[in-house]
Amino acid sequence: MIAIASIHYPISNRKHSHRGSWAKIWANILEADVVYGNDDYEKYDRVYIYHGMEWSGSFNLFGGAKDVTQFQRFLDSKCVFFSLDIDMPDYGAIGKSRLSNCSEEWANFDWDALTEKCKTITKVKMSDLKLCHLIVGDSHANSVYKGKSMVDRHDGKTLHGALMQGLNYYVEPYYHSNLNKVTFYFGNIDIRHHILRYADGSEEELMATYEEELKRVQDRYGVKLAVVAPLWIENESRKLPKSGYYDGTPFYGDWEDRNRMREFFAQRIEAMCDVNGWEFKQHSESLKNDKGELDFECMEKPKSVHLSPKYYMEEL
């Protein structure tokens, strides 16, 4: 039996949690259970340690450095552990760094033993899986997940930035003899924050470069391609966390202009897919309200730019 579990913070079971979707994607790939909250994982043979989508190198401890229950459980466990996505952090060193302001229980815990256990744990990355399908994109890539696919997620990456790097750069670490399809999903961030800052027709050049880069991927790796159109645009009243701001604002350009740009991107992507024999994909029209806006009900609660996992192309 296999489980996905977190040691330093509880995995959320909220069905609208975009952050929680990464654990569910891993669970789908590994055919594993997700251990939510502080539930026990001792009945499992193998446990893959989930560090969250945005591991910062420290513990986010509600109420301060007091409770060591989860660390003691991990230290005592006989399960075989693996670290998802990143090298196993030194939880012992992180715990010791909080000794100046902590509970007696925290101060007396054997952090050195925890360090030694962390050293024994092997990292598992998506690129180790050698699956047939790869999805490459920004943080919205989760929303187009299809069962048993590798996901190469680059939070905050614009289409422009990805093209400057070259799309082959993202495929190369995942390439193997079984890889036969790659799906690309970029562009939402460009539309939200960047492309309307330039009144020089740069969107035409961006789409032309996108097509050329996609051709390079197909020529080099001989894979089928799918390209996803940008997500529908939500109403401007949507409250967003400051992490979604750029240059102090939640978006640049009004709804009409950004929607026009989204339609341009979608039309050009569909046209290049038609000409080159690639698959064109876009989110369901049912995600829009009667004004043509992305419905808040379909978005992560309480505030985010992302879809709720309930409304992904394939519900997790």
Role assignments for model-derived ranges:
Residues L61-G63, G95, I191-S202, E236-P250, ...:
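Surface-exposed, active-site-proximal loop segments in enzymatic domains
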Residues L99, N235-S284, S304-V305, K310-E314:
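Substrate-gating cap/lid alpha-helix
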Residues A65-K130, L231-I233:
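Catalytic core of nucleotide-activated saccharide and alditol-phosphate transferases
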